[in-house]
A protein has these predicted regions:
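Minor-groove-contacting beta-hairpin "wing" of winged helix-turn-helix DNA-binding domains
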Residues: 1
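Glycine/Thr-rich phosphate-binding loops that ligate phosphate moieties of nucleotide
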Residues: 4-229
Length: 229
């Protein structure tokens, strides 16, 4: 979350970082919400459980069911990041019944990405004293239209996906170009951003409240005495 040129006081559950520094003596700061596991949970479905053979299969499998069937996966394989910062949390699957299928588990893993993003963004906006008006997404998971739509539903704001899905690498290239004079300003670079698809928020349900219950069950699972580096 871009918070301008004044370095903020540390906020509970958030990291303070430098968003960029153009060498003009006025770095731009940001609040960062750290989510430890997102795409790695899809890899776990593939390599650990054998539910899918390719990561690209998770989207169609997750969308083959209307919802997770009450299943929640908290992928706290290495603890929980923002806003909980709980190194003793561990991965949890709750809500399993005899009717649970691999599709429900895949759906719950995809939904966990949505819920974790909502939790981090809500903590960031509280800490920054701002209101979110839209979210721009990128990365491999952003190609899943249904997931991005659910993200818009959970946040209650439009979610915008650019034509270039790997904007982290693109941003590094832009900064290098600024340093070498390829572009004259950040504003000039901003005008190069192009929209692929805009997802407008629709009605959501109370599943996030259930997700928070699942998170509580994952927390403090280990103790300081049993955690081994």
């Amino acid at each position: 979350l871009n918070i301008g040129t004044v370095c903020p006081e540390p906020a509970e559950g958030m990291l303070t970082t430098v968003a960029w520094d153009l060498g003009d003596g006025h770095p731009t700061y940001a609040l960062e919400g750290a989510i430890f596991v997102t795409g790695a949970a899809v890899q776990w479905l593939r390599d650990g459980l054998g539910i899918i053979s390719e990561s690209s299969e998770v989207g169609p499998l997750a969308e083959s069911v209307p919802d997770s069937g009450g299943v929640y996966v908290v992928p706290a394989f290495t603890g929980l990041g923002s806003p909980w910062w709980d190194p003793y949390a561990r991965g949890t699957i709750v809500g399993i019944t005899r009717g649970t299928t691999k599709a429900h588990i895949a759906r719950a893993v995809v939904d966990a990405m949505v819920y974790q993003t909502r939790d981090a963004i809500e903590a960031m906006t509280r800490a920054g004293g701002v209101q979110l008006t839209e979210l721009r997404v990128d990365g491999g998971a952003s190609v899943m239209n249904a997931m991005v739509q659910r993200q818009a539903n959970e946040l209650g704001v439009p979610v915008l996906r650019p034509t270039d899905h790997e904007t982290t690498a693109l941003g590094a290239a832009y900064l290098a170009g600024l340093a070498e004079g390829v572009w004259g300003s950040v504003d000039e670079i901003g005008q190069m951003w192009t929209l692929d698809q805009r997802f407008e928020p629709q009605a959501t349900d109370d599943s996030h409240a259930q997700w928070l219950r699942a998170v509580e069950r994952s927390r403090q699972w280990e103790s300081a005495d049993t955690v081994v580096d």
